[in-house]
Amino acid sequence: MLKFIGRHRPSFLAVLLVANLTVLVLPVVGTYVLYRLYEGTHLVRSTEGDLIAQGAILSAAYTTSFSRILASESDRRAYGVPVNEKWRQVRDPETEPFRPIKPRLNKLRDDVYLPAPNSTTGYEPDPIAIQVGRDIQPALIEAKVVTLTGIRIVDFNGTVVATSGTQLGESIANREDVQQALEGRYTSLLRQRVTDSTPTQLGQLGRRGRVRVFVNLPIILDDRVLGVVVLSRTPPKGFEAIKELPR
């Protein structure tokens, strides 16, 4: 047995070669793991955070326009649908003035859903929501040029009343995440991105990853859901984001 081991003992050169290869491979593997974590967690959550910020501003703009159009306080209190008891937040504005929403998506952990189902037709938007939508529609279109964010604002029935693109007057209430948001719950998820064989220049800039981040922010006033801001954007690829880091 000892003779067999002696005859098959690796040479010093072979041991040195294996050790050097290990030293070379470990940094590569470590760098790859860090890259995957950066792309799958940081960039996705950064995108979600940006969408939350945009959605909060649009939600505030919507409620401001809504309060101006529907001036009667009693009418406002009867408008929309009540927030589901499960999602109602009991807080004292004096002791808890802020209500932050933290990004939570993780491409390495969360499911990636199929592209959003097609919108449906045949639904009549709420008349008040139509007026509010007309007020803020130009802002949505201008924002998309800079942020590359797809934006839809739906009324309390899930019908699109303002959009940065298409589907105006159509319903997206067939999406489960939108249904939950219409109950007053913030929802976010990852979907497979839809590719286009003949994308525009803007589309080429926007479709740089394998997934698209979707955020659904309820528009709530006096514990009643007026509608939902639906936003989506493709996070940048890791290498592109790294190139933009300050040197």
Model-derived features with residue positions:
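Juxtamembrane membrane-water interface segments immediately C-terminal to a transmembrane helix
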Residues: 34-60, 69, 130, 245
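Extreme N-terminal signal-anchor transmembrane helix of membrane signaling/transducer proteins, especially
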Residues: 8-36
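Extracytoplasmic/periplasmic sensor domains and loops in membrane signaling proteins
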Residues: 111-141, 145, 159, 163-210
